[in-house]
Amino acid sequence: MKQIKLILVALGILAVSSVNAQTKAAPWPEMKAFHALMAGTFHPAEEGDLKPLKEKAAELQKAAETWQASKIPADFKEKETKETLDLLVKQTVEITAKVKANVSDKELTGLITSAHDTFHKIAGECRKTDGHEGHGH
């Protein structure tokens, strides 16, 4: 009888754990996709390598636009997140235009740095919690 009770308690704990895991904030796939492109363009630019940014500027812009069009998760401040995503899209549009205009690497580095800072505002300050997700670089 003790073993049955122990098994039932263990099953109950597993069920509660499973429900808790499911109620945690789901990842925002569009943010993760943008972050992957941002990391692949910003970090080389920090080191003076603008080639990845020049090659992927349009892709970065498209990812920002896709992210902007996606549903904002409940664990983000909706108004602040929307406004900051709008800014991020404007920044990536400008980056794409400046790449096409063949501006200096110094100017492009400044633009991608600003866009990177905007990304981190969304990832950190726009959250309803104190967490800062997705900055494993």
Language-model-detected regions and their locations in the chain:
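Bacterial Sec-dependent N-terminal signal peptides
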Residues: 1-25
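Immediate post-signal-peptide N-terminus of mature secreted/exported proteins
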Residues: 22-58, 128-134
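Short, structured helix-loop boundary elements
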Residues: 28-31, 50, 57, 78, ...
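Charged, amphipathic alpha-helical oligomerization/scaffolding segments
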Residues: 33, 37-40, 52-55, 59-62, ...
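Second-shell loop/turn segments in exported
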Residues: 42-50, 71, 98-105
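Short, solvent-exposed, charged loop/turn and helix-capping segments
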Residues: 64-82, 101
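Surface-exposed, polar helix/loop patches in the mature regions of secreted/periplasmic/lumenal proteins
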Residues: 81-137
